[in-house]
Amino acid sequence: MPALSTGAGSDTGLYEILATLPAQLQPHVDSQEDLTFLWDMFGEKSLHSLVKIHEKLHYYEKENPMPVIHSATALAEELAEELQSKSLNSEIRELLKLLSKPNLKALLSVHDTVAQKSYDPVLPPMPDDIDDDEDSVKIIRLVKNREPLGATIKKDEKTGAIVVARIMRGGAADRSGLIHVGDELREVNGISVEDKKPEEIIHILAQSQGAITFKIIPSIKEEPPNNDGKMFVKALFDYYPNEDKAIPCKEAGLSFRKGDILQIMSQDDATWWQAKHEGDANPRAGLIPSKQFQERRFALRKPVVSNQPQKVPNRKSSGFRRSFRLSRKDRKTNKFMYECKKSDQYDTADVPTYEEVALYQRKPNEKYRLVILVGPVGVGVNELKRKVLIGNSQHYGVTVPHTTRGKRSQENDGVEYIFISKHLFETDIHNNKFIEYGEYKNNYYGTSLDSVRSVLAKNKICLLDVQPNSLKHLRTSEFKPFVIFIKPPTIERLRETRRNAKVISGKDERGAAKPFSDEDFEEMIQSAEAMEAQYDHFFDTTIVNDDLSAAYNELRSTLERLEMEGFWVPVSWLHS
């Protein structure tokens, strides 16, 4: 690229832009061919000449010079006539020769045009026989390379015309700004689309390479200002457009998995939104079902997962486990006593489609987020929680449970339990003060919301393990919970790693802890699958407890990241 230079005192702004643009654009250019094109384009002499003209005009625009005379051409002609009548000497002959030169006449003509400001084009008069109903036609030429055009078409049921149904955000059509929803398509590359089906036109477009020429009649409907692209949602279901019979164009669909963060680019269509994956450098959006449309489809489907927990013979409290404390002396009672009142273990949650989210990172003066551990019986939730507490008891804490049973001699109120009367416990139940509660041997046991608040008030991270049906009640702006699902490995790994462990939910006839059986392993896996099927849209991360040490290290790393990094949370948590 030739060196750029300007005269002394001229504005170098545009020259600096031209000189730096190729280097600035280099990280965003995919091929060396495109980069060479940019260097050649910005090095064109004609472009530099235009820049010089622009700067000269800009200079005179600021100076605003006034013409001394508006008719220099007429003055020159009068002067020439007068000189013809004089005696001709060498100087007069030279002046007459100069005034007759075409270049000077053209210069004076341009001067008069600028002085009189008569440079605006004069349009011809409108013809008298024009049809008032005739539509204006626009010719558009787009270069789409190998990417899709980024627009869908449909046949207008009333007029039979082929119209643009949708413009995909970030696609070639959207970037051009020349094609709009509602535009009527007349020709593609000189081929009339009259009496053609949309599928035939799509085939023509697919066969076209490089530049495509459209003849369209612009839509008269004004498009509202585009404020899209600022909304982010968390997907609460898996979606594969190739399997969706309702999508208008499978190729335009965007596939995603449960838990993916999507940036919503357009909600103009009530049935099909346009979105892209958060952080994706590709500007093109894809079609996804709208929240309302997907909710209607889910509502029409029959539930495939039973709400009733698995029944296991001779297991008095199968499917439930609750350790209200980690280092209490009577753990043998609490391990198997808990049964939630009025609780199906896997209740029917709201129809999960999308949840609007925003990026959140805790500020130094804010309380810590509540950390919830969820997992099936025997998976090791309590052991992982215990190891975290042992590792840093000053930074992490657990709740103290409430009970209505009598205090034993070696117990202290507020340490092992918070001891309250049955009447007060039932009053607190009525006032929804308990996260979970149960009854064992005519005594109530429960975890209260205030016990969570008490841990957080000490500037500690509260570690809480609950049944999954309690999650939706804890997902509030007050607690901003981070939910970790502890998942069992395969049954083969369970047999290998836990065969010699002691079951925590039952005793044999002599009161000794029983080893895990295949029945326990199967129940653990089935319980985990049921939890995932119904509640995994609440889970922020999943840890497979294949090896306790590895699972603990992963848990500790997750807790450290939670304090240092931003995470996506429901937007309602930040606005309340």
Swiss-Prot record:
PROSITE patterns: GUANYLATE_KINASE_1, GUANYLATE_KINASE_2, L27, PDZ, SH3. GO terms for cellular component: adherens junction; bicellular tight junction; membrane. It comes from the Eukaryota. Residues 368-560 form the Guanylate kinase-like domain. Keywords: Cell junction, Membrane, Repeat, SH3 domain, Tight junction. CDD domains: GMPK, PDZ_MPP3-MPP4-MPP7-like, SH3_MPP7. This is MAGUK p55 subfamily member 7. Gene3D superfamilies: 2.30.42.10, L27 domain, P-loop containing nucleotide triphosphate hydrolases, SH3 Domains. It holds the Pfam family PDZ. Acts as an important adapter that promotes epithelial cell polarity and tight junction formation. Involved in the assembly of protein complexes at sites of cell-cell contact. The gene is mpp7. It comes from Xenopus tropicalis. Residues 10-63, 65-122 form the L27 domain. It is a peripheral membrane protein. Residues 139-220 form the PDZ domain. The lineage of its organism: Eukaryota, Metazoa, Chordata, Craniata, Vertebrata. It is found in: Membrane; Cell junction, Tight junction; Cell junction, Adherens junction. Residues 228-298 form the SH3 domain. SMART domains: GuKc, L27, PDZ, SH3. Belongs to the MAGUK family.
